[in-house]
């Protein structure tokens, strides 16, 4: 259980004990549901988001804007952005970030299909929405440089969370908040 992301030793123990207390039929149903999900859910052939179809629902949706592509590291990022209901374009999931320490270079990500897609579709804008970790920044800069010859490249703004206090923010977050400032409407 500890191999699951975000599951530490205590949570793993709680989950294991809970499963052991459940009737065997429930445990088998859970195991079967996991196996079925693994079999039925793959990656969209266009954007590499999770999908039970060859092309995901977002890419198939005729109401989505084709002239804007939002590049994210992971399908969890698509889900988070979709919850805002603000982005009306399409996505491209890289499948991670460049992380030499973990053996992940550009070749292990879906950067080549992204370049091909941008070259063919010629969107007006590509938005890079990658977390501002060291690896995320590296990925953003690398992908941004590759895309600049083809289209306008922007990145999402970073700054203070809603309800956050200035005194608790680190210097980098405050600096980015100042850089990303905009005029009041």
Curated annotation (Swiss-Prot):
Keywords, in A-Z order: DNA damage, DNA recombination, DNA repair, Metal-binding, Zinc, Zinc-finger
Matches recorded under InterPro entries: DNA_Rcmb_RecR (IPR000093), Rcmb_RecR (IPR023627), Rcmb_RecR_Znf (IPR015967), TOPRIM_dom (IPR006171), TOPRIM_RecR (IPR034137)
GO molecular function: DNA binding; zinc ion binding
Domain Toprim positions: 67-161
Residue intervals of every C4-type zinc finger in the record: 44-59
Family annotation (Pfam families): RecR_C (PF21175), RecR_HhH (PF21176), RecR_ZnF (PF02132), Toprim_4 (PF13662)
BP-aspect Gene Ontology terms: DNA recombination; DNA repair
Record-stated family: Belongs to the RecR family.
Matches recorded under HAMAP family: RecR (MF_00017)
Known role: May play a role in DNA repair. It seems to be involved in an RecBC-independent recombinational process of DNA repair. It may act with RecF and RecO.
Name of the protein in its database record: Recombination protein RecR
Species, as recorded: Trichormus variabilis (strain ATCC 29413 / PCC 7937)
């Amino acid at each position: 259980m500890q191999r699951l992301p975000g599951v530490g030793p205590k949570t793993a123990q709680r989950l294991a004990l809970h499963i052991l207390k459940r009737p065997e039929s429930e445990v088998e149903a859970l195991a079967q549901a996991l196996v079925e999900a693994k079999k039925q859910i793959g990656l969209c052939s266009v954007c590499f988001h999770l999908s039970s179809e060859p092309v995901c629902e977002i890419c198939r949706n005729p109401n989505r804007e084709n002239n804007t592509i939002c590049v994210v590291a992971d399908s969890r990022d698509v889900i988070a952005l979709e919850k805002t209901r603000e982005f009306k374009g399409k996505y491209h999931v890289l499948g991670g970030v460049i992380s030499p320490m973990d053996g992940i270079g550009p070749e292990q990500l879906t950067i080549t299909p992204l370049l091909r897609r941008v070259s063919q579709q010629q969107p007006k804008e590509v938005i890079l929405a990658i977390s501002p970790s060291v690896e995320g920044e590296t990925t953003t800069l690398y992908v941004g440089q590759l895309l600049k010859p083809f289209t306008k490249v922007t990145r999402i703004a970073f700054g203070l969370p809603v309800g956050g206090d200035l005194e608790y923010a680190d210097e980098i977050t405050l600096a980015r908040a100042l850089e990303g400032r905009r005029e009041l409407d």
